[in-house]
Design a protein with these regions (language model features):
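A beta-strand signature from Gram-negative outer-membrane beta-barrel systems
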Residues: 37, 136-182
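N-terminal periplasmic "start-of-domain" segments of outer-membrane beta-barrel proteins
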Residues: 37-74, 103, 145-147
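Extracytoplasmic beta-strand/coil segments of soluble accessory domains associated
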Residues: 72, 78-122, 150
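Short strand-turn segments of transmembrane beta-barrel domains in outer membranes
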Residues: 164-201, 211-223, 749
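Acidic/polar loop-and-plug regions of large Gram-negative outer-membrane beta-barrel proteins
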Residues: 237-239, 244-337, 362-406, 452-486, ...
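Membrane-embedded beta-barrel scaffold of Gram-negative outer-membrane proteins
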Residues: 351-353, 501, 581, 587-589, ...
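Gram-negative outer-membrane beta-barrel transporters
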Residues: 503, 641, 645-651, 667-760, ...
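C-terminal beta-signal and adjacent terminal beta-strands/loops
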Residues: 596, 743, 751, 755, ...
């Protein structure tokens, strides 16, 4: 007979060992303080956990991992890769150590439709909702991480998540002073050092804090280039009395300086470049890994032909934009997060989580060849230009940097007022603010040709930082590739009731959230009518046309002058759930939730001049919406943790880039619905002491409900009835870990990812693959060195060759509607070996 009792906690109160369940995995302090759940405790073993599997109690499908498992994985690895062992999540890593980023798919939803949160604050970009997995917290500082595969919390401050939530939380400082230092070495010249120092309790009020820093540098696993990452972190925690109240303040600063990877092109479905009857109909177009002399190591160009610099001669840089040294992805990110809980009176609790985030990043191809006498450089002048290469003439075409810089200042607040009506009924009201100032610029910058065969950008952010690095035209105007400012403001109100019935066997949660989302768009350049192209110039336009558009010089292309627009979106979204406990350690649960994703910034900057009213507008893109249904069963004993669920999702108003016949261009628009059903299973078992087994299975059947129009001729992509791209229908994972003695422990794990469609019409796919990883640790505690160990990790043990990320297309068949060029894909990292030595004090 199991010995059962209730344990109540808030997520901010950390426990020893592997206590991670229910509210401990909630996103915000408010959700943590609200999700008071039952934990099964079984004698001396503590809360139910079996290896990777951790008992959950919430009325939604959630899978959680903790630091004990995270620490067995490769040092410095992105937390998304570590979570990839859980069901429902497909994460494809772009390199063996995680600093190049990767791609998220969760029950078929891409990363921009999945909310990624850090101590409850949203991390998805405010403009296009992208998740940058290479900028996440050092894994050694993460206490726990969880995946809600279907629904968000009722107070989740998101205007983008239609496909679930990924959340992680930081370590709490310890009461005792101490810390550790560690160093890692690995393949591809991998070098990483990290340290953490806990102050212990300081001052008269039991204040605790920790400081941490890390530095990582390694070579790309293919091609030429390196990846460098520096991160600093700190946290301070102040308990307020002995009732769970506290104030905490924490923050990271992360700096990435990476060379990009280039994925190989894939074969066409016919194996030839052209459609039947065309000149290229018999030209082979096979997978580039088969035709390139570099094979699976195909990447950006390794050489650069030195451009000539000759006075009186028209020198032209004929190199492509694919030289490795000019393909970079720099970013500076940081945030400050506050978490707090205050008991106002018996049964009344207030939680307040404020935050500020900063982002400075650059991406894209970032370069162009600019003629020295171009109109951009002449500006309002009829003749002349700028001598860019210093050879004394204005005849040349010189490569310059054209960055796509994004600078975001983001302010957030997530607060809850929680009222315990009595022992079995609880009411919460919550308010969330997410305000982002999104500045997107592209000030041209210079390229350093001091070594003409190995050029480098003078500054990774172009002309943003230094005046001397800018390209200035004859009018004194700094050339720009883009210039716009966007404000994204979310005000959200939510209410939740939680009640226990039938002698606490039944827990019911009834919630609703009301997001009010506003986008302010300020375009400072001229927008090409019915296009996303812009012209940033000091050149004076011709007199305005009757419709308000303008032209330049003798050209007939119409542009819309700089403008400002405002768009608003709102909705009422229910979030319901129930859990029923019965028997010994058994329960069933069900949930229903609705979500929305407002149109992204880039969708809204494609504008036209309405031919009837002459006002500036664009096709009315409505928010995407989803309805998620979950039903699950859980079984927990002292040695077994099992969770099984079935689900259905209705995804409506799906936004894709399609042809609009009125605009005669491609724009983002709502094209229909996706219906998905599936099942997920996870199980952990500890058959004997020190042996842990874990396994998962995920099944997904998703179907597009509509076709969509491709071009002015009315060609249609036959997508109705097809499956979603990049989404495996089957995934399996397993892990075995065993502690042989007090000195040595090891684990081996594998993840199988099924076939994935490359094209919307499902005429091309990539093969399934299996990646096996190994970890082994030698612990030196028996030598009196508690917390000191040597760990080895081998990723992709069997050296599987596979495609990771995919550049999808409408079709892979030349001559078919929607075909443009061969698709491409990222290459999975080969076998990689690394070692980490940690010394604790």
């Amino acid at each position: 007979m199991m010995n059962r009792k209730r344990a109540f906690w808030a997520s901010t109160a950390l426990f020893t060992g592997m206590i991670v369940a229910g509210a401990a995995s909630a996103q915000s302090t408010g959700s943590s303080a609200t999700e008071v759940e039952e934990v099964v405790v079984t004698g001396s073993r503590g809360p139910a956990t079996a290896g990777v599997a951790i008992a959950e109690t919430v009325a939604k499908t959630r899978n959680t991992i903790n630091q004990e498992f995270i620490s067995t994985q490769a040092a410095g690895q992105t937390i998304l890769q570590t979570l990839n062992l859980t069901p429902g999540l497909s994460f494809t890593n772009a390199d063996p150590y995680g600093n190049s980023g990767g791609n998220i798919r969760l029950r078929g939803f891409d990363g921009s439709r999945v909310s990624l949160t850090f101590d409850g604050i949203p991390l998805n970009d405010t403009g296009n909702y992208s998740s940058y997995t290479n900028q996440q917290l050092d894994p050694e500082l993460i206490e726990r991480a969880s995946v809600n595969t279907g629904s968000t919390d009722v107070d989740s401050p998101t205007a983008s998540a239609t496909g679930g939530t990924i959340n992680y939380q930081t370590l709490r400082p310890t009461a005792d002073m101490g810390g550790w230092l560690q160093g890692s070495l690995g393949d591809f010249n991998y070098r990483r050092v990290m340290g953490l120092f806990n102050t212990g309790e300081i001052g008269p009020w039991g204040t605790t804090a920790w400081l941490a820093a890390s530095y990582t540098d390694y070579d790309k696993f293919k091609g030429i280039g390196e990846l460098e990452k520096t991160q600093y972190n700190a946290k301070i925690y102040q308990p307020l009395g002995d009732n769970g109240d506290f104030i905490a303040l924490s923050g990271p600063y992360n700096e990435n300086r990476n060379n990009n990877n280039q994925g190989p092109n894939l074969a066409t479905t016919t194996g030839f470049c052209g459609a039947p009857g065309t000149a290229t109909a018999t030209t082979p177009c096979l997978d580039q890994v088969k035709t390139s002399p570099f094979g699976w190591d195909v990447d950006f160009d390794r050489t650069y032909v030195a451009p000539t610099v000759r006075a009186g001669v028209a020198d032209i840089d004929t190199n492509s934009a694919n030289y490795w040294g000019l393909r970079i992805n720099p970013s500076d990110t940081g945030n400050v997060r506050g978490n707090s809980r205050f008991t106002l009176m018996d049964g009344l609790v207030l939680t307040v989580d404020p935050s500020f985030q900063y982002t400075l990043a650059d991406g894209g191809s970032q370069q162009a060849v600019l003629a020295e006498n171009s109109q951009l450089l002449r500006g309002t002048k009829a003749t002349g230009g700028v001598d860019l290469n210093g050879d004394g003439d204005l005849l040349d075409s010189v490569r310059v940097m054209t960055p796509s810089v994004t600078n975001t200042h983001r302010y957030g607040l997530n607060s809850s007022l929680i009222w315990d009506i009595n022992d079995t009924n609880r009411l919460r009201v919550a308010y969330a603010l997410d305000y982002g100032r999104h500045r997107q610029t592209g000030q041209y910058g210079k390229i350093d040709f001091s070594n003409p065969t190995d050029p480098k950008f003078v500054d990774p952010f172009g002309g943003r930082n230094e005046e001397d690095n800018r390209i200035v035209n004859l009018d004194g105007y700094v050339l720009q590739a883009r210039d716009r400012k966007s404000i994204a403001e979310l005000n959200q109100f939510s209410v939740e009731y939680r009640g226990k019935f039938l002698q606490d066997a039944l827990t019911v949660s009834l919630g609703v959230r009301a997001p009010f989302f506003k986008r302010e768009l300020n375009q400072y350049c001229y927008s090409q009518n019915s296009s996303s192209n812009v012209l940033c110039t000091s050149q004076l336009p011709n007199a305005a046309l009757a419709n308000g558009n303008v032209t330049f010089g003798a050209a007939t292309t119409q542009y819309i002058p700089p403008y400002a627009r405002e768009l608003k979106y709102d909705d009422i979204l229910p979030n319901l759930g129930a859990t029923y406990r019965f028997g010994e350690g058994q329960s069933i649960y069900g949930s229903y939730s609705e979500s929305l994703s407002a149109p992204r910034t880039d969708s809204l900057y494609t504008v036209r001049r309405n031919p009837t009213t002459n006002v500036i507008d664009n096709p009315t893109v409505q928010p995407e919406t989803s309805k998620n249904y979950d039903l699950g069963y859980r079984f927990t004993t002292s040695t077994v943790v099992l969770q099984a669920s079935v689900f259905a999702n209705e995804f409506d108003n799906r936004i894709v880039s399609t042809y609009d016949p009125e605009l005669d261009t491609f724009v983002d628009r709502n094209v229909g619905s996706v219906k998905s059903t599936g099942a997920e299973l996870s199980a952990g078992w500890e058959p004997i002491e020190n042996l842990s087994l874990y396994g998962t299975a995920s099944f997904l059947d998703s179907e597009l409900q509509d076709n969509y129009v491709l071009n002015a001729a009315g060609a249609v992509a036959a997508t109705k009835g097809k499956k979603q791209v990049e989404t495996p229908e089957e995934m399996y994972s397993a892990r075995i870990s065993y502690k042989f003695n007090e000195v040595f422990a090891a684990g081996i794990q594998a993840k199988y990812t099924g076939e994935r469609w490359v094209t919307d019409v499902n005429d091309q796919k990539v093969d399934a693959y299996t990646v096996v990883d190994l970890d082994a640790r030698f612990d030196f505690a028996t030598l009196g060195l508690d917390g000191t160990y040597l760990q080895f990790n081998v990723t992709n043990l069997l050296d599987e060759q596979y495609y990771s990320t995919i550049g999808t297309r409408t079709t892979g068949t030349p001559g078919q509607p929607g075909y443009s060029s061969p698709a491409f894909a990222g290459v999975g990292a080969p076998r990689t070996v690394m070692a980490t030595l940690r010394y604790s004090f």
